[in-house]
Amino acid sequence: MKTRIALFALIIFSVISCKKHKTVEEKTLTSLEQLTTGNERFLNGRSAHPHQNKKTVLANQDGQKPFAVVITCSDSRVSPEIVFDQGIGDLFVIRNAGNLISDIDMGSIEYAVEHLDTKLIVVLGHTECGAIKAYINDKDGSYKKHFNHIDNIVETISQEKEEIDADKKTPKATNYLGAINANIEHSVKLIQDNPIVKEHQVKIVAMRYDVHTGKVVEL
């Protein structure tokens, strides 16, 4: 009986120690390190699922203080809070097909930077992106395959300078990963040129998520 009690006490102590260690770790890691270490936990099946409880909801009810902005694709396989193992109030997420930057998206970025004082912006593209596949398959450049708003996505990507340059070096039909990276690079450059982002000296990072492995790499 005493052995069982001692074992139970040891388990409780270990859990409390781990929670305390994680709290200290969060405070010492940079914003980018919080994302990369979170992805490592996700990859290794050790997701901590932080800040996902009623206590966190109450702590954020009067405002938010996200440590990073993440611009990513609408693809259901690419959920930033999951792949980076973050929780409520941690990330300011902007999503659309192809992780593009429209005026509205830029306005959202400006809000996070100017009003929430967020100091890290991540553009997170991903493998097997349907928007990039549609662009690659648009061989004749007509864009009008669906005769609806989907065509606008393809046209926007096809006009990106980085995509045009990449296609000149290696035809897009044989350079799928290059097309994904060029699209990410284009969004990064648009953000870098934003006056508010410049003024607040925000760090901007290009990343790519692999839907086959769950791994995020920095470009």
Segments and roles (model prediction):
Residues 14-17:
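C-terminal motif of bacterial Sec signal peptides marking the signal peptidase cleavage site
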Residues 19-65, 88-89, 98-107, 111-116, ...:
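Divalent-metal-activated hydrolytic enzyme cores
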Residues 72-77, 97-100, 126-127:
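Short glycine-enriched loops at secondary-structure junctions
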Residues 85-93:
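Short helix-loop-beta junction
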Residues 123:
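Conserved functional hotspot residues or short segments at active or partner-binding sites
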Residues 1-5:
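Positively charged n-region of N-terminal signal peptides that target proteins for export
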Residues 81:
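Portal/gating segments that form or line small-molecule/metal binding sites
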